Amino acid sequence: VIMQERTNSNRKNHEKPGPPEIRSIAVGIDCSPHSLASLKTAADLASRMHAELLGIFVEDINLLRLTELPFCQEIRQYSPAPEKIESTELERMLRSQARQAEASLQREAEIFRVRHSFSVRRGNVPKEVVAAALQADLLVLGRSGRSPTCRKGLGSTARNALSGSLKSILLMHEGYAAENEAVLVLCDGSDASKAALAIAIRMLRPGNTLHILLLPQYEGHEHLLESELSGQLPPGILRVEYHVLPHVSDSRILARYIRMADSGLLVLSDRMNLPAETVHNLINDIDYPILLVRS
């Protein structure tokens, strides 16, 4: 990794591609730790971007169908024997979770003073979340949900959003604090990567470092690319570091180089010159908060 640090002064007056407008932010809420972290980040973003916050809770139809199976039982912590799952009890639990989700949304909306709405849907959770977010400009999700099988990778809702949605997606995890974290952005000179850089600039907090990860397309391209991208940066960003990454299509190798640069929010697009499959595999491989920009 080749690293260079620049102070942001005497920028050239190149034409700056504007970031996609974000007027509404949808967030899926299931009360898991990753989901609640996503909600806090979404509310913060809505406040900073003067956007409306749309909370989504989905009653899982697959859980409800379990009650129709005669052999389906549950084992409770203090119960001596398995018990049949009753549909009325499950309905009550889902309503309780929905109330918790709405209360969490209202609490964050009040803290950040943003307009908000809340909707409850029933169906396949990944599909319903994506469908409910069709009118939003940004969908915010936890990297993983409640299922123990997805703790080390992406949850089913996040995977479905990657493959089935055309929206920009922000994937969060518990413990991320934007005010203390750097922002990293993958840039290869394509219009999609320039849009990602424009969004990354908006995500950066004052005083934090912006890491521009260059993916040159030919020998010597990194110098032209750095010069071109430097003209896109506003004068207020004082800490900028450029990193030249090797031309690789293996997401695991790419993730290794990104980790060498820094940790923080990783901003990228699956419409760059890098194959979309590589981008999606990278998102699964690297345990960073991810903002996937689709403009």
Language model regions located:
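Gly/Ser-rich helix-loop-strand patches that form or flank binding pockets
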Residues: 2-12, 21, 35-41, 47, ...
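Small/aliphatic-rich secondary-structure junction motif
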Residues: 4-84, 179-244, 263, 285, ...
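Aromatic/hydrophobic pocket-lining residues that form π-stacking "cages" and hydrophobic walls in ligand
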Residues: 42, 105, 129, 200, ...
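Short glycine/proline- and acidic residue-enriched helix-loop micro-motifs
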Residues: 82-92
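Active-site beta->alpha loop and helix N-cap motifs at the rims of alpha/beta catalytic domains
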Residues: 90-96, 121
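A structural motif corresponding to the C-terminal end of an alpha-helix
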Residues: 100-117, 236
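Short, flexible loop segments at the rims of nucleotide/cofactor-binding pockets, characterized by
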Residues: 116-119, 147-150, 189, 242-246
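Charged docking surfaces used in two-component/phosphorelay signaling
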Residues: 120-127, 245-251
